[in-house]
Curated annotation (Swiss-Prot):
Keyword terms of this UniProt record: Actin-binding, Cell membrane, Cell projection, Cytoplasm, Cytoskeleton, Membrane, Phosphoprotein
Function of the molecule: Downstream effector molecule involved in the transmission of signals from tyrosine kinase receptors and small GTPases to the actin cytoskeleton. Promotes formation of actin filaments. Part of the WAVE complex that regulates lamellipodia formation. The WAVE complex regulates actin filament reorganization via its interaction with the Arp2/3 complex.
Recorded name of the encoding gene: Wasf2
Record organism: Mus musculus (Mouse)
Entry protein name: Actin-binding protein WASF2
Gene Ontology molecular function terms on file: actin binding; protein kinase A binding; SH3 domain binding
């Protein structure tokens, strides 16, 4: 329906009740003339309102134009008549002045109570007033106004504001979640794209001939055979594994008893300092996930000739010689190429050097003794007569050895356990359980304490930016902002209680 801003009265000029004692024509004429005069009075009143508003706007516009003209004149004088050679502007004077910043007022609240036109306000005041339900507001427990249940002009604005604030909160939660995922996965943005597979490399290999393709396929990325394996710092090939590819046994050994191969779980790791010499004849047999036997179960390895000392392979330097073994109270066992029982893994023992003087690299750690020699006791059961030999340092640092007691060889008693609750002296004071301890436990468990001044906090939020322009500008700033820091203005606890 159209909104009537100005109503000219009376609407009907001739609709009047005529008296019965006078002439009808004369009465009708007089009544019509009087109503016409009244309508002209209404028109003159509305014309005064219209032209008065136009005059007010014109005067405000004229004042703005005059102010702008004065500023333009001052700027023109400074631009045209200022001589930079005579008048020097100090740097301090420039820094003390504030930069120009225009303050643009946004047009909003177009349909507010204060922006109502005068005729519309008069029409509104002529209507019946709502019942005085606000007198019941002090008796409500929820603190809401009773009149808002009858009529609430700000209902739609409050509904829209709640929706906008909820959307802003959801956007901030999503951005905070993405930032957290980005911090947890720093390499997420640096994902390498998958390489496109083409047959160009294959045709490049086949360009020189089929025999070169096979030789290139055998070699690894560094030019060595693809079957090269590494063990204890040495390089060897599985294809060259034979009886002559292992170091010779010591000269004092007369026989060696073969034993079945061990699995990876029962085989102890060799020390890191002792490695195989990097020559052409020695290698490792670790070609798969499981270790294989170092010797054949039926044939002992023959000793290589000592007339020609092994020369180091070019490109690989032999490892340094280990220090001499410390004195031991227990005579060292004579090593052999056989293994002991699978259930008793041997401890690492000091290395034995070959009698040849030209042999610079140390041999690999000897295997456990055969059944012909007595089994040496483990390091944990050595008597205290002699200091236990320091084991060679493995790659990961192991736990320190247990302390030993006297000559009985038993480990020293562990430190006494802490006194139990039964042995602790009971305090005469009872356990303190008051509101402070409960408060501390609640804070530690992460519970959010209920705010005491919820109403004041809500009033503060309503005062700051409770209009359409501020809410929309905040929403746009949140959506298009790329800052990494979380603003306290959009914190979760600030908008939801």
């Amino acid at each position: 329906m159209p909104l009537v801003t100005r109503n000219i009265e009376p609407r009907h000029l001739c609709r009047q009740t005529l008296p019965s004692d006078t002439s009808e024509l004369e009465c009708r004429t007089n009544i019509t003339l009087a109503n016409v005069i009244r309508q002209l009075g209404s028109l003159s009143k509305y014309a005064e309102d219209i032209f008065g508003e136009i005059c007010t706007q014109a005067s405000a516009f004229a004042s703005r134009v005059n102010s702008l003209a004065e500023r333009v004149d001052r700027v023109q004088v400074k631009v045209t008549q200022l001589d930079p050679k005579e008048e020097e502007v100090s740097l301090q004077g420039i820094n003390t002045r504030k930069a120009f910043r225009s303050s643009t007022t946004q047009d909003q609240k177009l349909f507010d109570r204060n922006s109502l036109p005068v005729p519309v306000l008069e029409t509104y005041n002529s209507c019946d007033a709502p019942p005085p339900l606000n007198n019941l507001s002090p008796y409500r427990d929820d603190g809401k106004e009773a009149l808002k249940f009858y009529t609430n002009p700000s209902y739609f604005f409050d509904l829209w504001k709640e929706k906008m604030l909820q959307d802003t909160k959801d956007i901030m939660k999503e951005k905070r979640k993405h930032r957290k995922e980005k911090k947890d996965n720093p390499n997420r943005g640096n994902v390498n794209p998958r390489k496109i597979k083409t047959r160009k490399e294959e045709w490049e290999k086949m360009k020189m001939g089929q025999e070169f393709v096979e030789s290139k396929e055998r070699l690894g990325p560094s030019g060595y055979s693809s079957t090269l394996v590494y063990q204890n710092g040495s390089i060897g090939s599985v294809e060259n594994v034979d009886a002559a590819s292992y170091p010779p046994p010591p000269q004092s050994d007369s026989a060696s008893s073969p034993s079945p191969s061990f699995s990876e779980d029962n085989l102890p790791p060799p020390p890191a300092e002792f490695s195989y010499p990097a020559d052409n004849q020695r290698g490792s047999v670790l070609a798969g996930p499981k270790r294989t036997s170092m010797v054949s179960p039926s044939h002992p390895p023959p000793a290589p000739p000592l007339s020609s000392p092994p020369g180091p392979k070019p490109g690989f330097a032999p490892p340094p010689a280990p220090p001499p073994p410390p004195p031991m109270s227990v005579p060292p066992p004579l090593p052999s190429m056989g293994f002991g029982s699978p259930g008793t893994p041997p401890p690492p023992s000091p290395p034995s050097f070959p009698p040849h003087p030209d042999f610079a690299a140390p041999p690999p750690p000897p295997p456990p003794p055969a059944a012909d020699y007595p089994m040496p006791p483990p390091p944990l059961s050595q008597p205290s007569g002699g200091a236990p030999p320091p084991p060679p340092p493995p790659p990961p640092p192991g736990p320190p050895p247990l302390p030993f007691s006297g000559a009985d060889g038993q480990p020293a008693a562990p430190p006494p356990p802490p006194p139990s609750e039964a042995t602790k002296p009971k305090s005469s004071l009872p356990a303190v359980s008051d509101a402070r301890s409960d408060l501390l436990s609640a804070i530690r468990q992460g519970f959010q304490l209920r705010r005491v001044e919820e109403q004041r906090e809500q009033e503060k939020r309503d005062v700051v930016g409770n209009d359409v322009a501020t809410i929309l500008s905040r929403r746009i700033a949140v959506e298009y902002s790329d800052s990494e820091d979380d603003s306290s203005e959009f914190d979760e606890d600030d908008w939801s209680d």
